[in-house]
């Protein structure tokens, strides 16, 4: 039985649920935006979940747009775990946003689960007020995809002849693609397969499809890189078993070849004996190349790809998160590696391995890598070096960059969002919450310009849960340059408020008892002068 979106949040699972719901009051409804303009669209009344960071320049503006649980007059409800964001401007005073929701019906942890599978919203926004005029599903929950993280909208700038949105499953579970996604048993669904795929959406036609040849792994993002004769899409493995992450490139002749999955997958290999994160130190600058991945491996399961990568000495990062290309030199690519405290050298092989629980190794904070692709051949890497490295500062240091996750670039800056591990979280008031950092290309300055505000946690007006997160327990995500809408320095981003439980309801998925929860969150815009 598929779970699909409906006007009522609870209606999405009526056939599955039993019990009495606990629902927090969300102070948002289908009302006009601030200022009283009835045509300006909906704006949330939930307080902003971001504040200026410790190093923010004067003039930062933070404007919340829509919060999890907000419902429009159409019945559309903004769902939990908002993540990747892409946008277009349509020239009629409106902009279209595509917003991922990293939801899943596969319980984790324990018996806790979301109300929906992952899905992508299309939000139509008033360009002047940033109010939401309408909203629909671009990729619905009943497509049975899981945990969409970042997304990327490829278009003419990247060599595509039409706009294709790439969205990505960060998941390893076996799920039914028809019927009820989980449990993957014939009694409730069919077409079972392992998750971890890339999904392409033609935003004009509305058609979407899986691109299996892009590889099955924990995709954080798939980013098209401009400037080559063929289309090049880079992706990284945001593995759940770090350190065992790789960087891949999908190369195809044109947009139709991508859409019809006629391209080929390639994997990055370092040269001169450099084959993992631990081999590279500050000041090192290595070369490398991409090698072809056999088609049967690329479309196989995640274990097959991991086994093949090890056998072929593919460079092992710790845990690649987002990717962004330089807006001035598009063959320069930035890679966020979130690090892993349990990553330690294997005494038998010298390569990194995962230590036991409680291990505190030398890589707790992560790095930003800088990769330079050959201008004429995207399979050749002229340089791989470390741009930012805060691993040596150790865990729990307030001034360190903690576990970089999402990235965005402008002509001036690299924007970096943190997803802090427990080792980099603090008692409330004793250290920062998760931040957004700005790295200024001209000077190399790194400054914290935004910070997540967790003050709504356990507010009885919003939260029916009983757990208070430590500082850093919430994260911001999905940052994207919004200068096309509002001018330089403007960004769209969202907040995932994992311990802000708006709704909790016991029920069943097939024969399995679960607890459905809706976590809080928010979509915002922010102005950062000089960014």
Placement of each model-derived feature along the sequence:
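Sequence/structural signature of beta-propeller domains
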Residues: 31-531
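Cleavable N-terminal signal peptides
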Residues: 19, 30-31
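N-terminal secretory signal peptides that target proteins for export/translocation
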Residues: 1-9
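Gram-positive Sec-dependent secretion signals
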Residues: 9-15
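Bacterial N-terminal signal peptides
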Residues: 16-25
């Amino acid at each position: 039985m598929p779970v699909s979106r409906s006007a009522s949040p609870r209606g999405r699972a009526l056939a599955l649920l039993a019990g009495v719901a606990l629902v927090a009051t969300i102070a948002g409804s289908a009302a006009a935006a601030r200022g009283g303009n009835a045509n300006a669209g909906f704006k949330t009344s939930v307080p902003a979940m971001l504040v200026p960071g410790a190093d923010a320049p004067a003039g930062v503006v933070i404007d919340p747009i829509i919060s999890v649980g907000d419902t429009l007059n159409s019945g559309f409800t903004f769902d939990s775990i908002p993540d990747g964001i892409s946008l277009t401007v349509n020239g009629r005073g409106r902009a279209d946003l595509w917003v991922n929701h990293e939801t899943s019906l596969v319980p984790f942890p324990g018996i806790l689960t979301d109300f929906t599978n992952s899905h992508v919203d299309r939000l139509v926004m008033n360009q002047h007020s940033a109010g939401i005029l309408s909203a629909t599903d671009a990729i619905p929950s009943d497509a049975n995809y899981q945990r969409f993280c970042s997304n990327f909208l490829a278009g003419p700038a990247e060599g595509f002849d039409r706009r294709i949105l790439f969205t990505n499953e960060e998941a390893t579970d076996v799920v039914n693609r028809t019927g009820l996604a989980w449990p993957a048993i014939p009694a409730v669904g069919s077409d079972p397969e392992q998750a971890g795929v890339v999904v392409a959406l033609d935003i004009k036609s509305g058609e979407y499809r899986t691109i299996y040849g892009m590889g099955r792994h924990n995709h954080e993002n798939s980013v098209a890189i401009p400037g080559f004769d063929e289309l090049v899409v880079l992706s990284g493995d945001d593995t759940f078993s770090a350190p065992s992450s790789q960087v891949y490139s999908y190369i195809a002749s044109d947009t139709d070849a991508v859409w019809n999955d006629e391209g080929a997958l390639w994997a990055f290999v370092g040269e001169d004996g450099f084959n993992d994160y631990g081999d590279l130190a500050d000041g090192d600058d290595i070369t490398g190349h991409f090698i072809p991945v056999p088609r049967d491996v690329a479309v196989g399961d995640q274990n097959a790809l991991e086994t093949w990568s090890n056998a072929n000495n593919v460079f092992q990062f710790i845990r690649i998160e987002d990717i962004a290309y330089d807006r001035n030199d598009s063959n320069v690519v930035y890679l966020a590696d979130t690090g892993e405290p349990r990553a330690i050298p294997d005494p038998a092989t010298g390569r990194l391995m995962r230590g036991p629980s409680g291990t505190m190794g030398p890589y707790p904070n992560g790095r930003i890598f800088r990769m330079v692709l050959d201008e004429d051949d995207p399979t050749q890497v002229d340089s791989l070096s470390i741009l930012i490295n805060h691993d040596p500062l150790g865990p729990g240091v307030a001034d360190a960059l903690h576990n970089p996750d999402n990235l965005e670039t402008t002509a001036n800056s690299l924007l970096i969002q943190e997803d802090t591990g427990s080792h980099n979280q603090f008692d409330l008031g004793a250290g920062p919450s998760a931040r957004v950092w700005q790295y200024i290309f001209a000077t190399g300055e790194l400054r914290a310009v935004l910070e997540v505000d967790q003050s709504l946690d356990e507010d009885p007006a919003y939260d029916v849960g009983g757990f208070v997160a430590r500082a850093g327990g919430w994260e911001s995500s999905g940052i994207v340059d919004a200068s096309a809408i509002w001018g330089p320095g403007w960004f769209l981003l969202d907040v995932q408020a994992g311990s802000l439980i708006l709704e909790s309801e016991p029920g069943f998925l097939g024969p399995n008892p679960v607890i459905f929860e809706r976590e809080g969150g928010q979509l915002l815009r922010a102005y950062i002068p000089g960014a």
